[in-house]
Amino acid sequence: MNILVFSDSHGRVLDMFNLVENLSPDAVIHLGDYDEDAQDLRRSYPDLTVYSVRGNNDYGSDSPWFSVVTLEGVKFYLTHGNREGVVWTSCGNIAEHAKKFGCSIALYGHTHCANHVIDDDIHIFNSGSISLPRQGVASCLSLEIQNGKLIDAVFLNTDGEPISLTKQKNKSKFRWF
């Protein structure tokens, strides 16, 4: 099962839609900001399974602040991250929440910075921002799950090409708070 993970699209959906069209994922996860963009995916691709949570800019959204889903036998904790205290240099208490629900993978956004850490045997990924990156490269995350295991995790640019987190530099002239 291939899963595309997006966060922080902020209404700029063209790259997100192009990636879905070109990569044909089995499911999409949107981690907030803007939840309406996930709704647009659902309307445009009615046969595509789309999971979403709300972010700090999703005023009036009915989506949950977090969600726990099981895909191909792997349990995921989904959140935007703002309520778990994430910052550029820390995943906050996401590992604690994921562990409480028995999840082996936690996904979050909010910082606009792609990241992967392992904390207490839990893989914690931030897909970065598909539209307003703080690291200079807009990104999403592609996960491959088979037989109850994470087989592959690759950060992709807006063309669907793999990117290395170590090669990204903060080229933005903006400071995001």
Predicted regions, residues:
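Active-site neighborhood of phospho(di)ester-bond hydrolases with catalytic His/Asp-centered motifs
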Residues: V5-S7, A27-D33, Y51-N56, L78-H80, ...
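Short, solvent-exposed coil/turn elements at secondary-structure transition points
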Residues: S9, N56, N82-E84, I130, ...
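Short, electropositive, low-hydrophobicity segments enriched in small/polar residues
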Residues: G11, D15, E36, Y59, ...
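His/acidic metal-ligating clusters that form di-metal
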Residues: L23, A27, A38-D40, G60-I118, ...
